[in-house]
Amino acid sequence: MSSSVAERLAIRDAIGNKVELRQNWSEDDLQKVFRAAYEQIFGRQGIYASQKFTSAEALLRNGKISVRQFVEILAKSEFYKECFFYKNSQVRLIELNYKHLLGRAPYDQSEIADHVDIYAARGYDADIDAYIYSSEYENAFGNSIVPYYRGFQSIPGMKTVGFNRICELYRGRGNSDNAQMGRTNSRLRTKVSLNLPNGILPPTSAGTNFVSAAPTLISSATKGDNRMFVIEAIAGGLNTNVAVRRSRQVYTVSYERLSATYQEIHKRGGKIVKISQV
């Protein structure tokens, strides 16, 4: 790819931007790792992150954890959940997890469905582990490299739609994933469910903070994953000191509502007993 094309698509700074914590590192090397990790995992919100992860930084500085484990702490943190988990639809969260943790976009419906299944069966932390402790992560980043955007270059196992899809998700360095046009909606669901490539639209103005001009990709569940799930939960007694008998409740929801219902139950102080597919 020519440098002019990369610049027009606002991906020049992202290509091959690899940060590794090598042996005999200096404090400057460590600070580069911190900055790269915060920007990769949180995007624009990363400017607020350093104050929230001083303990994790100390663990990495003292050799108690690896770069991979540092990334794991960030992705499982309440701050990451506040930025992306609580605010977004299930599919949008999966898109962002692929972007932040593997440096690419999901290629097809099966990759999205796999993470829906993991989340439904084993919860949020297990789903994050499925990215960070995958063979793909191991081969791409190992224990010492901060995840970076690999999808702009040819990578092992890459599908031809990969470049188009990551262009739709990336939208410029340091952008806000939550401030793009489309907000909390999936950017890829329609094209992924129809097995079609995304069009490539350059950001609206090169050299600035970019916002996608692409239309929001919204489709009904019948065009994507139309599975239904049953959530069994024990009702919570949040914000009350009165002893009450907790009732068992059952929710039948589409996979698009799975994440939102999960969050609502926990916010009310409930406990999820089981999630199963209908």
UniProtKB/Swiss-Prot annotation:
Residues 2-178 form the PBS-linker domain. The gene is pecC. Disulfide bonds: none annotated. Its main location: membrane. It comes from Nostoc sp. (strain PCC 7120 / SAG 25.82 / UTEX 2576). Associated with the phycobilisome, a hemidiscoidal structure that is composed of two distinct substructures: a core complex and a number of rods radiating from the core. Belongs to the phycobilisome linker protein family. This is Phycobilisome 34.5 kDa linker polypeptide, phycoerythrocyanin-associated, rod. Keywords: Antenna complex, Membrane, Photosynthesis, Phycobilisome, Thylakoid. It holds the Pfam family PBS_linker_poly. GO terms for cellular component: phycobilisome; plasma membrane-derived thylakoid membrane. GO terms for biological process: photosynthesis. It comes from the Bacteria. It is found in: Cellular thylakoid membrane. The keyword Aminoacyl-tRNA synthetase does not apply. Rod linker protein, associated with phycoerythrocyanin. Linker polypeptides determine the state of aggregation and the location of the disk-shaped phycobiliprotein units within the phycobilisome and modulate their spectroscopic properties in order to mediate a directed and optimal energy transfer. It is a peripheral membrane protein. The keyword Membrane applies. Residues 226-278 form the CpcD-like domain.
